Amino acid sequence: MSQSATRNFCIIAHIDHGKSTLADRLIEMTGTLRHDEMCEQVMDSMELERERGITIKAKAIRLRYLSKDSHEYRLNLIDTPGHVDFSYEVSRTIAACEGAILVIDATQGIQAQTLANVYLAIEYNLEIIPVINKIDLPGADIPRVMGEIKSVLGYDEDAVIQISAKLGLGVPELLEAIVARVPAPKGDGKLPLRALIFDSHYDPYKGVVAYLRVADGNINKGDDLRLMGQGTEFKVLEAGYFAPAQVAALRLDVGDVGYVATGLKSVGECRVGDTVTLQHGGAIQPLIGYHPAKAMVFAGIYPTQTDDYHELREAMEKLSLNDASLSYEPESSPLLGHGFRCGFLGLLHLDIIVERLEREFNLSLVVTSPGVSLTVTRTSGEVLTVVNPNEMPLPHEIASIEEPWVSVVIITPSKYIGTVMDLVRENYGVYKNTEYLGQLAMSELGQRVQLHYDMPLRSILTTFHDQLKSRTQGYASLDYEFVGYRIANLSKIDVLVNDVAVDAFSRIIPPDKAHEIGEALVKKLKEMIPRQLYQVTLQAAIGSKIVARADISAKRKDVIAKCYGGDITRKRKLLDKQKEGKKKMRQIGKVEVPKEAFLSVLKLQ
């Protein structure tokens, strides 16, 4: 099929706005799959994706479409994740397309992550087709959403297509708009090969299978190729396209979206966003879009049963074959045994990895409190990267600490501006500006407002998103983007049990929250640690300064039970002997901290 009859497009949307359902309708209405072959969320092949209703990895499928004027077109649809953690996956998918369908929920309107993805599409010069979905729902407010689209994105009513992806309403008109408005791929088949990798997965028989878009030249089975960013070389074992299963083809031409089987042993050798070219006589200039995805959130993962460490290690190795953005290295803790310090793109990424480890590999896990990567400069001038609180130098050895900051966009009804501003202020946010989303965007909750802040990444890591939803009754949405490192005033708080620090309870906090967090930690531990035969002292400390304390009183054995009446000095002697014994026990005794205590402390944010 000619290059002029090819259309490459993606679907971008906020999470749960109906992106995967629309992909299903496009597949069904173009006859790519028969009705009996269809299942809900065809593009979401991972069980976890279907269950949570989210897209985690980018997918691609080739559709054949016969337009109303009887011309046949090849439509390459690339599905993208909608969650902020996977924004890098969205960016490289967008780089592989000429057009984007922007899906907006008729009941919710424009959300923060919708805007982030739109700006990305504009940056890559994509033709955007705005679509209002879920028009069949009773809560649909089409005039309001249309007003938002016009005021925020600048599209007239005529350019917006109204659909119900669930019922298929308006989808035929959308297909016509795709062939009419999305430009054909440019590229030159005579130039040296350049193809952009937008995803990959590991196949036990074919090695790494790279999903790519051919920008110039073509790919044939048996070609010797090279990755321009990493320098990795491989031979094409198989090339083909997705329908949605892999279908082998003789070659991939300029503008095509398909796959190549590389025979490589790990997705780390075939990074997403890299440019593929020929080993001999290849291109000189790579395509845009490659920068390695960087882990932003770190947490320790340990098996509940220490015997399961080897199973956990094997599971981590298998998961990392398909997820180049997951980093891990072994670490050990006196309380939790052997485990791994892992790096993730964000909290959802962490959540998904833990759920996959537990579900697919049948492991029971303990996950430590998530933190960020800090840059610490010692007084000696040495610069350290600290991802584990226990790696933090002593306070007098630290010259400065830098932490990652993010630019945050919150969209909320104006009714909740005050509560949102209070929440952000409590979490060390710095206000930048406010924008109103158009005069027509009115409802009983007031006009919708876009608030811009800079915030430390650690502030939004734990319960910030839940608190935002709770304080705005679920109406607010959030998007954030890494903007760099800034000087931070942070300290490590330790928990001491009978003067011995327990490493698993250490965390890095702002000093002004030390008393509040310290009190909460020792109070929770006091509830969870069983009483011993001697007094147990729990302390929270920053360096040598104690900021909170609680005591667990000793169990007392009745040593004078057998003394009936008689001389009081005999009783005193027995009680003094008991007191001496307890003093000695406290010096040499080891308090067993149960894992339940650790888990309950973890839930304290």
Curated annotation (Swiss-Prot):
It is a peripheral membrane protein. GTP binds at residues 16-21, 133-136. SUPFAM superfamilies: EF-G C-terminal domain-like, P-loop containing nucleoside triphosphate hydrolases, Translation proteins. Its EC number is 3.6.5.n1. CDD domains: EF4_II, EF4_III, LepA, lepA_C. The keyword Nucleotide-binding applies. Residues 4-186 form the tr-type G domain. InterPro entries: EF-4, EFG_III/V, EFG_V-like, G_TR_CS, LepA_C_sf, LepA_CTD, LepA_IV, P-loop_NTPase. Keywords: Cell membrane, GTP-binding, Hydrolase, Membrane, Nucleotide-binding, Protein biosynthesis. It is an enzyme of class 3 (hydrolase). It catalyses: GTP + H2O = GDP + phosphate + H(+). GO terms for cellular component: plasma membrane. One of its GO terms (biological process) is positive regulation of translation. It is found in: Cell membrane. One of its GO terms (molecular function) is ribosome binding. Belongs to the TRAFAC class translation factor GTPase superfamily. Classic translation factor GTPase family. LepA subfamily. NCBIfam families: lepA, small_GTP. HAMAP family: LepA (MF_00071). Required for accurate and efficient protein synthesis under certain stress conditions. May act as a fidelity factor of the translation reaction, by catalyzing a one-codon backward translocation of tRNAs on improperly translocated ribosomes. Back-translocation proceeds from a post-translocation (POST) complex to a pre-translocation (PRE) complex, thus giving elongation factor G a second chance to translocate the tRNAs correctly. Binds to ribosomes in a GTP-dependent manner. This is Elongation factor 4.
